[in-house]
Design a protein with these regions (language model features):
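Extracytoplasmic
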Residues: 41-43, 61, 69-72, 89-91, ...
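Soluble periplasmic/extracytoplasmic beta-strand elements of cell-envelope proteins
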Residues: 45-49, 57-59, 93-95, 109-115, ...
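Active-site SXXK
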Residues: 54, 68-86, 154, 186, ...
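Polar, glycine-rich mid-to-C-terminal structural blocks
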Residues: 107-231
Length: 381
């Protein structure tokens, strides 16, 4: 029996094992929860619905629409399982154009075609010192083609999901922070960078940004963060997608060195190209032209890249939908936004090849698959 359980609380509700025989227990459990001391003024909406039998298993204010928060990720991950399958792995493909001469010089460019793999260099799948290990595999693939030098550039193409940067409606106060990282056809390192601060021993004193990992060329931070007498991070980064001008406000603990604050990456597509160029240079394979993201080329009038006349170097598979969904559902908000929308974009691309639909259209198409569920999901995202 297929059962979809959707619950939206101001507090987290414990997972319930559902079967037809346990229906009364489910209703009793939600009634007990809703009547608990301290929840008298809480907004609680719950419904468990049996799609096969088209019957309500249990309900408490089931028709009341409230802000669903992190629970909406269940729609994306469930639809990904249903549509793509648990074993689906997004791919990042590497191509080259031009010819390789007798000296190993490629007279052409390397193209990286992103497939929206949210696991590429992700801290959820790799230890900190192994997050860039995939680049070594990519470099080895380039060398296997006999390429020793590139008379051209690295071009990353994240156009598979379009270039919205972030869905409409995302909070301005989120976008510059790590939990506000938007989806991209080229995702790398969770589209996140670590800012390393040192702080004074004095209260209400200035802080200093010492470095960042990975280093992002052109990143500029107006730092208005001061010290305070606490051990927690109360720093907030502000900045729009594709904008390298950021500013920071709030507080950090006093008398610290190398205090890390996580922030979003302005342009993941370009960062991936730059990271690959560095990895090649570390193996003495140099390019003659600086790396570029395809978005900037589009702004200059470039046409979509035709891969039919290019030669494939490597097709790199990311983690499976099952693996990605596990971490998405089990972790808090920090992982929800980027991966949930990345899954939605992957879904819409699989349904409509070549589509450049916005996130709002992806969500509307997801609603169609859940019309039998007695919920209003118009407010998702």
């Amino acid at each position: 029996m297929k059962i979809i359980v959707v619950y939206t609380f101001c507090l987290f509700f414990a997972n319930l094992s559902l079967s037809q025989a346990d229906n009364n227990k489910v209703q009793s459990a939600i009634n007990e929860f809703a009547s608990a001391a301290g929840l008298e003024n809480a907004a609680i909406s719950f419904m468990a619905y049996d799609i096969d039998n088209k019957t309500t298993i249990a309900s408490h204010n089931g028709e009341m629409a409230i802000a669903p928060a992190s629970i909406v990720k269940l729609f994306s991950t469930a639809t990904a399982f249903e549509t793509l399958g648990k074993d689906f792995q997004p791919k990042t493909e590497i191509f080259y154009d031009g010819e390789i001469d007798s000296n190993g010089v490629l007279n052409g460019s390397i193209n990286i075609k992103g497939g929206g793999d949210p696991s590429l260099g992700s801290r959820f799948f790799y230890d900190r010192d192994q997050q860039s290990a995939f680049l070594n595999e990519w470099v080895a693939a380039i060398k296997s083609k006999g390429i020793k030098e590139i008379n051209g550039q690295i071009i990353t193409d994240g156009s598979e999901f379009g270039y919205d940067g972030a869905p409409d409606g995302w909070s301005w106060s989120d976008l510059g922070n790590y939990y506000g990282s938007g989806p991209s056809g080229c995702v790398v390192y969770d589209n996140m960078t670590y800012l390393h601060f040192s702080t004074s021993a004095q209260l209400n004193d200035v802080t200093t940004l010492d470095s960042m990992t990975p280093r992002i060329e052109g990143y500029s931070l107006l730092n208005q963060v001061t010290t305070y007498n606490s051990s927690s991070d109360n720093c907030y980064i502000y900045g729009a997608p594709y904008s390298y001008d950021r500013f920071a406000i709030g507080n950090l603990p006093k008398n610290r060195s190398n205090f890390e604050v996580k922030a979003s990456v302005p342009d993941p597509e370009l960062l991936l190209a730059q990271e690959f160029e560095k990895a090649l240079a570390n193996d003495s394979i140099f390019t003659t032209t600086r790396p570029a993201g395809f978005r900037s080329m589009l702004l200059q009038g470039a046409l979509p890249i035709d891969y039919s006349d290019k030669k494939e170097v490597l097709s790199y598979s990311g983690k499976s939908i099952a693996d990605v969904a596990f971490w998405t559902n089990m972790r808090r908000l920090e992982r929800l936004k980027l991966v949930t929308v990345a899954l939605q974009e992957a879904l819409i691309t699989s349904i409509d090849t070549g589509s450049r639909d916005s996130t709002s259209k992806c969500t509307k198409r997801m609603e169609v698959g859940y019309q039998e569920v007695m919920l209003s999901v118009q407010t998702i995202l």
